[in-house]
Amino acid sequence: MSKFNRIHLVVLDSVGIGAAPDADKFFNAGVADTDSDTLGHISETAGLSVPNMAKIGLGNISRPIPLKTVPTEDNPTGYVTKLEEVSLGKDTMTGHWEIMGLNITEPFDTFWNGFPEEILTKIEEFSGRKIIREANKPYSGTAVIDDFGPRQMETGELIVYTSADPVLQIAAHEDIIPVEELYKICEYARSITLERPALLGRIIARPYVGEPGNFTRTANRHDYAVSPFQDTVLNKLADAGVPTYAVGKINDIFNGSGITNDMGHNKSNSHGIDTLIKTLQLPEFTKGFSFTNLVDFDANFGHRRDPEGYRDCLHEFDNRLPEIIANMKEDDLLLITADHGNDPTYAGTDHTREYIPLLAYSASFTGNGLIPQGHFADISATVAENFGVDTAMIGESFLGHLK
């Protein structure tokens, strides 16, 4: 019998809690990630008031310097720790795949200076369309169409760009390049980025509409991902008949592998929380696992190095945390964590190699305190033990520490 009938894992994308032991091997604009500290620096420079996460024990997590504006709790309502990454990457897919039990020893490729000419030329030859070279770099998806959409409308060229993650994105105005044509181009791009030197996690079709100054991306986005290289705990749950629910970009990250119910993309963190709450309320969801990603912290504020915006985004989540808890059942378990860091006060614009926080809460808890410090995959090992399935490659369960 399961200790918890339902477990809900919420990933606050990029909310790291201090430099990892191997941060000296990861860099931002030539600066090692050794002094990165997403939560610590936001608390220090912008102020951080997250009373609901503090109540669970966020401020009790072991750190060299306590979080400046997040108090410790003498009697927290949950259990907390921080977790270390073992995989050789600090991107979204690597973090999520490791959380679900995989050790990624061959990291995906990222392209901070844009994609090499060889790839661009192949896409041009296949599509019969030129590529706007100036867009070929890490770019905000809305900014890139604002900057190059007018030119695309005039010339029919492709907008090819990337991000901090191992992705190749192609934006196209639906009136200029039909969606089906864009999909064919993306399928081709997927076929040429499955091995080094361009091993990419996802190719993303990004259609948009509108006029210069008023472009909007449409719901016709399509992701061409790769599945995890071996079964994760998601697969083991699904194979055992345990329902799995994906909220936000989780389904894309795992290419649908091990997901039995995709609840759709999030338009924003707030929309994602709404979707999670609707998922919690589903009458058929009496047992199983929900997995939510809230990406605004990372996409809107971490990469843009905006500590005040990041702080406000954390406040928004914390304000809504009681709503999530109110829709849980007594024998539910809530796990709140991250997938990497993205210190908005740091050099560069890339993710940062950090520990991730872990907060565990259940109305059924009679105890509280610290979980032994471990690794990302301990989360999936705990989920696996609870539902009576095998772990994946790595991970040690902390289920026995939750009283």
From Swiss-Prot:
GO terms for biological process: 2-deoxyribose 1-phosphate catabolic process; 5-phosphoribose 1-diphosphate biosynthetic process; metabolic compound salvage; nucleotide metabolic process. Its cofactor is Mn(2+). It is found in: Cytoplasm. The gene is deoB. It comes from Streptococcus pyogenes serotype M2 (strain MGAS10270). The lineage of its organism: Bacteria, Bacillati, Bacillota, Bacilli, Lactobacillales. This is Phosphopentomutase. Pathway: Carbohydrate degradation; 2-deoxy-D-ribose 1-phosphate degradation; D-glyceraldehyde 3-phosphate and acetaldehyde from 2-deoxy-alpha-D-ribose 1-phosphate: step 1/2. Isomerase that catalyzes the conversion of deoxy-ribose 1-phosphate (dRib-1-P) and ribose 1-phosphate (Rib-1-P) to deoxy-ribose 5-phosphate (dRib-5-P) and ribose 5-phosphate (Rib-5-P), respectively. Belongs to the phosphopentomutase family. One of its GO terms (molecular function) is phosphopentomutase activity.
